[in-house]
A protein has these predicted regions:
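Alpha-helix initiation/capping motif
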Residues: 15, 107, 171-173
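Structured, hydrophobic secondary-structure cores that serve as assembly/anchoring elements
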Residues: 134-180
């Protein structure tokens, strides 16, 4: 039996080639409108990974990659553990401090490159340590992508419940009010 009812994926893989493959795979899980219209279930996924490659580039919008000097700190898992349990619309991923994650030892040029390449990292700025920038590989904020996925899922669930529970939805103000 196959259970595809999950959302986040994290692995212990840190090799850049494998991280990129997982980012690409997560990107491929978002169904097209045509597929959804044909009845394909929406089981989109979201990948969190980490690397110690200061030149790594993340190009995929359904993934987040963190940079860490010490991969044994599992910055990606610590970040998901500190923010993931909250409802998508109730939390911002930037500015969070995952437990047990050290500030990366980076020169300014390396920090700039990581930001340009859409890779998140622990930073110390203005006497505060936090995860920067809270973005996915396409530059969108993590909370925006997770929130949009959550809203999409909830709308679909609610519409199915309405259509199943009602014999007919009239094409009237009352029908529109029921669906709205």
């Amino acid at each position: 039996d196959h259970n595809d009812d999950w959302y986040f994926i994290l692995t212990d893989v840190t090799d850049p080639v494998c991280v990129t493959a997982l980012c690409k795979w997560a990107e491929s899980t978002e169904p097209t409108e045509a597929a959804l219209g044909a009845g394909v279930e929406d089981h989109r996924k979201f990948y969190f990974g980490q690397t110690n490659d200061k030149e790594y580039v993340n190009e995929y919008g359904r993934s987040v990659v963190t940079y860490a000097d010490n991969l044994a700190e599992w910055a990606d898992a610590a970040w998901v553990g500190s923010v993931g349990p909250f409802w998508p619309e109730s939390v911002t991923w930037k500015w969070k401090v995952p437990d047990g994650v050290s500030v990366a030892d980076l020169r300014d040029s390396e920090r700039d490159l990581l930001e340009e390449n859409r890779v998140n990292f622990m930073t110390a700025e203005y006497k505060h340590e936090y995860m920067k920038n809270g973005i996915c590989g396409d530059g969108n904020f993590i909370d925006n992508v997770l929130g949009a996925d959550y809203i999409t899922h909830q709308i679909r669930e609610n519409l199915y419940e309405i259509f199943i529970a009602n014999k007919k939805i009239a094409y009237t103000d009352d029908g529109f009010a029921l669906v709205a």
